[in-house]
């Protein structure tokens, strides 16, 4: 028989840097999960993606065991990395902070494809372009 799910926890944690301190500790401690076990497993699984923020969905079962699924990094994080900026513009419609080539947008869209609700890479590109626009990043051909 399948184990009964008692809690779903969604977190965004820097790759390879999960530790028992907040936000990880309190979120998992309430569910009675072995926090160090999760941290070690998460860090091992995301060691190759250092520097990126990784969304993770943790499913906690009745017997306090857990499974987790790592998602692709948020489009905003990938855009900031490609553009080489620290943060987006406070006034995206007035001041633009960077420009990104369309082929880089395609790369990001292809990376995000498994997690996006898009039928094609072109649709995913439009989503990523919208994120870029809201951050004050100009897309050029």
Curated annotation (Swiss-Prot):
Keywords, in A-Z order: Methylation, Ribonucleoprotein, Ribosomal protein, RNA-binding, rRNA-binding
- Extract the GO molecular function terms from the UniProt entry: large ribosomal subunit rRNA binding; structural constituent of ribosome
**Is Metal-binding tagged as a keyword?**
no
> Which residue spans traverse the membrane?
none
InterPro entries the UniProt entry points to: Ribosomal_uL11, Ribosomal_uL11_bac-typ, Ribosomal_uL11_C, Ribosomal_uL11_C_sf, Ribosomal_uL11_CS, Ribosomal_uL11_N, Ribosomal_uL11_N_sf
UniProt superkingdom: Bacteria
- Among its keywords, does the record have RNA-binding? yes
Q: How is it modified after translation?
A: One or more lysine residues are methylated.
- GO CC aspect terms: cytosolic large ribosomal subunit
Biological process, per Gene Ontology? translation
Q: Which family does it belong to?
A: Belongs to the universal ribosomal protein uL11 family.
What does the protein in this record do? Forms part of the ribosomal stalk which helps the ribosome interact with GTP-bound translation factors.
Q: How does it assemble?
A: Part of the ribosomal stalk of the 50S ribosomal subunit. Interacts with L10 and the large rRNA to form the base of the stalk. L10 forms an elongated spine to which L12 dimers bind in a sequential fashion forming a multimeric L10(L12)X complex.
Query: What's this protein's name?
Result: Large ribosomal subunit protein uL11
Q: Which organism is it from?
A: Bacillus anthracis
Q: Which gene encodes it?
A: rplK
